[in-house]
């Protein structure tokens, strides 16, 4: 049953006479406490926060003096007391509330400055179970929710970044805070506790291997506001979840303009793709446009890999995203800056490479310090009208033992290497996906078509265009291998690849007409390998 309201109007300005400070993150704490003291605000505090304030000679009263009860159970119980929550929740214009405060000796609290135990940090650093549980804050969220609910009389501050604004408002309004400002702080406070509880909920689900919990929360903290979203009429913001997976969200931007919404989306796609290739074994480069690869290649050096990737579709690569699985060096940088590029993302960049890229002031250069693990668990989410689709991250990686030769002819070693390369790339191409590969480089990519045969034809045409631009006598699809992200429902898609010049095929299999497709491959002397793993991408 809902609780009814007494409809007591809130004051526009409310004087801050008493503040409660209890923080885990002590950034800016002392200067803020000094400013409050200068405004004549009485400061209550807890544990380490009180000690830090007192050490600077700022008058402070420990909460235990107010409650008449000491901290117990290793600090688990210190603010869970009517003297605290009554002071936060009391409606100051309600006679019954005021009478209760007087009867029980409860003083009002007008400002609650609370930030929480660093649960998210401990979680993503891989803390053990007991340590992570111990960093679940109880009293902090309770005080935040109490004070934010009572924003008519209490201002709630959960972020040190807001200290300066609070001080400015106090100075502007002679020690009072306006209702609109208190509402703004309350909204942020509830967002903070919601995100905190979401992190705890998601961690527990992971801890007990519950993949589809009854309640699923996705939360993040605003990192930056975009100029616009996918299109200029759309608003957008970039939120960080706290996950420490190397990538665009955790990267350091060394130079260039602010990343746009589309830049972030494309850069993430590019870096996740290039991470499929072990830098200890090979150098790899991916060039991305609209979250689809224009070209991907591996080679002995980053420069060579870039040039091979670029050759796949040099027209589409203009204005693209370039991702590397190794350090950006001078030789590669000199080649990349020859055409207009939006973003370069790499684990690192040499000083010489940075100097070369610096000549292109708008070119964004990101370094990540490492590569994401393609096999790591995680979630992927999409919104639909009235709902949220959540699935596990596509972390499937095909190993040699997963491969099954289903044709009369087995692939050669060279074909097999290219097939595995092509299938990894195909995982990152929008479905229906067809990828032609030769000598460790894509030579034609067909993406996002409703018909698999159309994707095969588009990839072949792309290869023909690239060959013509390079002055080659014939497309590089002659003697290539082909990968499909899903099974061939009919033999026509396979026959299109054969017509383009493919000599070997890798695909998941699983069609009702697999036998028909295999027979067509045998008829044309094609080697075919099935993986048993589909990689739809929408």
Swiss-Prot record:
Q: Record's Pfam families?
A: AICARFT_IMPCHas, MGS
Pathway annotation from the record: Purine metabolism; IMP biosynthesis via de novo pathway; 5-formamido-1-(5-phospho-D-ribosyl)imidazole-4-carboxamide from 5-amino-1-(5-phospho-D-ribosyl)imidazole-4-carboxamide (10-formyl THF route): step 1/1; Purine metabolism; IMP biosynthesis via de novo pathway; IMP from 5-formamido-1-(5-phospho-D-ribosyl)imidazole-4-carboxamide: step 1/1
| Annotated CDD domains | IMPCH
Tell me one GO molecular function of this protein. IMP cyclohydrolase activity
List GO terms (cellular component aspect).
cytosol
Keyword Coiled coil attributed: no
Query: Start and end of every MGS-like domain?
Result: 6-158
Listed EC numbers: 2.1.2.3, 3.5.4.10
In the record, biological process GO terms are: 'de novo' IMP biosynthetic process
- Family from the record: Belongs to the PurH family.
HAMAP family named in the record: PurH
Relay the domain remarks: The IMP cyclohydrolase activity resides in the N-terminal region.
Name-wise, this protein is Bifunctional purine biosynthesis protein PurH
**Organism in which the protein naturally occurs:** Brucella anthropi (strain ATCC 49188 / DSM 6882 / CCUG 24695 / JCM 21032 / LMG 3331 / NBRC 15819 / NCTC 12168 / Alc 37)
Name of the gene: purH
């Amino acid at each position: 049953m809902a609780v009814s309201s007494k409809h007591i109007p809130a004051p526009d300005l409310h004087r801050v006479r008493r503040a409660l400070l209890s923080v885990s993150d002590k950034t800016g704490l002392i200067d803020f406490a000094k400013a409050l003291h200068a405004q004549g605000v009485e400061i209550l505090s807890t544990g380490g926060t009180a000690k830090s304030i007192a050490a600077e000679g700022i008058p402070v009263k420990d909460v235990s003096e107010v409650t008449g009860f000491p901290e117990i159970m290793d600090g688990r119980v210190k603010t869970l007391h009517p003297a605290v929550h009554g002071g936060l929740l009391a409606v100051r214009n309600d006679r019954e509330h005021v009478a209760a405060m007087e009867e029980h000796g409860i003083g009002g609290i007008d400002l609650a400055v609370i930030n929480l135990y660093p649960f998210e940090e401990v979680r993503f650093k891989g803390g053990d179970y007991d340590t992570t549980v111990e960093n679940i804050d109880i009293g902090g969220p309770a005080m935040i929710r109490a004070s934010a609910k009572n924003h008519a009389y209490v201002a709630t501050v959960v972020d040190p970044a807001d200290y300066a604004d609070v001080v400015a408002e106090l100075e502007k309004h002679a020690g009072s805070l306006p209702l609109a400002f208190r509402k703004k702080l309350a909204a942020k406070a509830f967002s903070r506790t919601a995100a905190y509880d979401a992190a705890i909920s998601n961690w527990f689900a992971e801890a007990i291997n519950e993949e589809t919990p009854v309640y699923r929360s996705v939360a993040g903290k605003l990192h930056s506001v975009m100029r616009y979203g996918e299109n200029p009429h759309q608003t957008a913001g970039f939120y960080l979840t706290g996950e420490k997976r190397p990538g665009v969200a955790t990267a350091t931007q060394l130079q260039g303009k602010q990343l746009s919404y589309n830049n972030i989306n494309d850069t993430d796609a590019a870096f996740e793709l290039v991470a499929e290739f072990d830098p200890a074994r090979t150098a790899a480069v991916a060039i991305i446009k609209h979250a689809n690869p224009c070209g991907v290649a591996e080679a002995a050096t980053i420069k060579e890999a870039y040039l091979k990737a670029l050759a796949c579709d040099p027209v589409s690569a203009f204005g693209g995203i370039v991702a590397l699985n190794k350090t950006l060096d001078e030789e590669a940088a000199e080649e990349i800056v020859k055409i207009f590029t939006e973003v370069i993302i790499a684990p690192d960049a040499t000083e010489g490479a940075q100097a070369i890229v610096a000549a292109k002031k708008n070119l964004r250069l990101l370094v990540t310090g490492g590569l994401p693990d393609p096999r790591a668990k995680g979630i992927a989410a999409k919104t639909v009208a009235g709902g949220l689709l959540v699935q596990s991250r596509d972390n499937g990686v095909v190993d040699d033992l997963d491969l099954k030769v289903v044709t009369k002819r087995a692939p050669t070693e060279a074909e097999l290497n290219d097939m595995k390369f092509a299938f990894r790339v195909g995982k990152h191409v929008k479905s229906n996906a067809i990828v032609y590969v030769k000598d460790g480089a894509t030579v034609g990519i067909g993406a996002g078509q409703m018909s698999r045969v159309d994707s095969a034809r588009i990839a072949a045409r792309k290869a023909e265009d690239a060959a013509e631009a390079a002055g080659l006598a014939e497309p590089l699809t002659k003697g290539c291998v082909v990968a499909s992200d899903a099974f061939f429902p009919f033999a026509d898609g396979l026959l299109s690849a054969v017509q383009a010049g493919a000599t070997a095929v890798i695909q998941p299999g699983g069609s009702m007409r697999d036998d028909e497709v295999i027979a067509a491959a045998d008829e044309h002397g094609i080697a075919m390998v099935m993986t048993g793993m589909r990689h739809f991408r929408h």
